[in-house]
């Protein structure tokens, strides 16, 4: 019997080498992805720690400024607010065309829908036009965080997608340096350079009727007159908590 070694055909040899190369490439790509994800997680954790420190420092500074003002016998004057949260509290009946267009512009197309709005001269004028149909005010860090975590959805290809994974946020906002849900929250809170992109990515929040009702006999009177609509400043946080 011949002891001669059976040779592998050249085509089979090439195929085997190609398969080996592909397997090596897959392993290398997997290792690279794992390393990249590990690095990304470290970046996100580092940013989150920095954000938390930033929020706590800002809160302490305000408390100290109020104490200093009181000690000096004066009043603490807050910096001008840059952000409001607006909730639509009236349906479609008896709304004139112009306010209706503004509600659509601000993406407040349904009752109990809410959006963040950057405070500018132009947006303040828009809010005046729709004031009888909305409640708005200055959201706290806690309110913004709870809204995004509990009610946050992204707008992807005109679809409402839950923010269940940071990868969803990175895929849509990564080019702006927004990699995680906490990056997104920070961009909203600070009204950062990419606020417009971050805010447009967020689907308008769908809130519930306030737990325990509106608590006022005349819902469609101004807030300062004992009603519900208009600017309620920091009291918007209490309303959102009841609706979230």
UniProtKB/Swiss-Prot annotation:
Gene it is expressed from: RPL7B
Membership in a protein family: Belongs to the universal ribosomal protein uL30 family.
Task performed by this protein: Component of the ribosome, a large ribonucleoprotein complex responsible for the synthesis of proteins in the cell. The small ribosomal subunit (SSU) binds messenger RNAs (mRNAs) and translates the encoded message by selecting cognate aminoacyl-transfer RNA (tRNA) molecules. The large subunit (LSU) contains the ribosomal catalytic site termed the peptidyl transferase center (PTC), which catalyzes the formation of peptide bonds, thereby polymerizing the amino acids delivered by tRNAs into a polypeptide chain.
UniProt-listed InterPro entries: Ribo_uL30_ferredoxin-like_sf, Ribosomal_uL30, Ribosomal_uL30_CS, Ribosomal_uL30_euk, Ribosomal_uL30_euk_arc, Ribosomal_uL30_ferredoxin-like, Ribosomal_uL30_N_euk
Principal location listed in the UniProt entry: cytoplasm
UniProt-listed SUPFAM superfamilies: Ribosomal protein L30p/L7e
Family annotation (Gene3D superfamilies): Ribosomal protein L30, ferredoxin-like fold domain
Sequence segments annotated as region (Disordered): 1-21
Listed name of the protein: Large ribosomal subunit protein uL30B
Biased segments, Polar residues type: 1-11
Gene Ontology biological-process entries: cytoplasmic translation; maturation of LSU-rRNA; maturation of LSU-rRNA from tricistronic rRNA transcript (SSU-rRNA, 5.8S rRNA, LSU-rRNA); ribosomal large subunit biogenesis
Keywords: Cytoplasm, Ribonucleoprotein, Ribosomal protein
GO CC annotations, alphabetized: cytoplasm; cytosol; cytosolic large ribosomal subunit; nucleolus
